[in-house]
Amino acid sequence: VVVLVPGADVVLTGVSLPTRNRGRMAAAVPYLLEDQLAADVEQSHFALGERDASGRLAVAVVDRARMDRWLSQLAEAGLQPDQLIPDLLLLPYEEGAWSLLFEPGGVLLRSAPQAGLGIDAANAAFMLQRTLAESGTKPERLRVWRAEGVPAAVIPEDLGVETSDETLLVPPLMLLAGQAHEARAINLLQGPYSRSERLGRVWRPWRPVAALLAVWLVLQLGMTIFHNRQLDAEQARLRAE
């Protein structure tokens, strides 16, 4: 089960780390990003992505309370997700191009395989200019999709980037779902939210009960063997008489 979550609720960033050990990276990332984040790192969940060509490690950051709320809502609906992915990371990606989707309520931008941001529609032009200015390398092309009924937002002409309007023949969700096989998207279900860890939390309260049950079974087996041996001995005695 693949579940998409709002990209506007997830911060996609990156860090440079010398180690290749995933455990050490997971432990170091929160403190390396502490000064860059407005939120308390103790209240934030960090999911690791891949390294880019420069060796920079992609990281997704989301509020723990928000993660808990998403998973609780899914559990109430009877769903156990295998992947929780920021929606903007399933925008079609093309090397050398950025993808921009205007949908009801906001704008999604994917600027790299594991980078991008969710933008408020009113601030789309400003944020796009700012992101381009902060980017080390400008894209060759800006691919733009617009959902039906969404007003055509003005893209500044002075971006210095070729813009191509893509035809959107399906609802935005279908466009994203078509990329659900995208292996480079960051799965937020890592660390304490990994499937194995979540199952472990479910079973952890029952471990003492399971231990007592195991002891009871061992005792029952021992008593059964003891009684069987007594019966064998009694039968042997009777045959001897």
Task: Give short role names for the model-derived ranges.
Residues 1-241:
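Hydrophobic/aromatic-enriched cytosolic interaction surfaces used to assemble or bind macromolecules
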